[in-house]
Amino acid sequence: MKTILIIVIIALVGLAAFGVVYNFAITPPSTSTVTSSATVNGLTLTISGEITRPGTYVINEGATMIDLITAAGGTTSNADYLAWNADFKCVNKGSYYISPIYDNSNTCSLEPIKKANLNADTAETLQAVAGFTKTVANAIVSYRAGAAFTCLEDMKLVSGVGQATYISTRDKVTLRSAEA
């Protein structure tokens, strides 16, 4: 009887230890970095896309896009450096996206995604982007006459560009030309 009781106790302890180890192994690491000084006067920013550790971060006020990218561990090798502005001043509670150079679908892509330049291309070129109508392409050209696009999220400030259009087109546009 004592032998059975000892075996049961050992089995229960083993199961408990396994449960703790298993729970620790499947818990993803935290993606947010919070410093005590940043929580008082910091910006809460979310970054996604071609970033090493996408997530929400609290960083110092006055932070630029490069500060946010650095806090998130940098970009992946597939990040399109022409689609973000390193000097852009982040806005509190802002959500930022780093688009890819190559398509991330299940197919192997050998050619970079053809992208339209929000700050330079004509309405006709912008209209060729799947997701942009003639009206939206003209609205983009009108918008940039008053202010250049400084981040991809600025597209949402254009009349006719909502969240759905932004999401469907953000990988197909850039802020600068490769020659710039």
Language-model features, listed with the residues they occupy:
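Ser/Thr/Pro/Gly-biased, low-complexity, turn-/loop-rich segments
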Residues: 1-159, 163-180
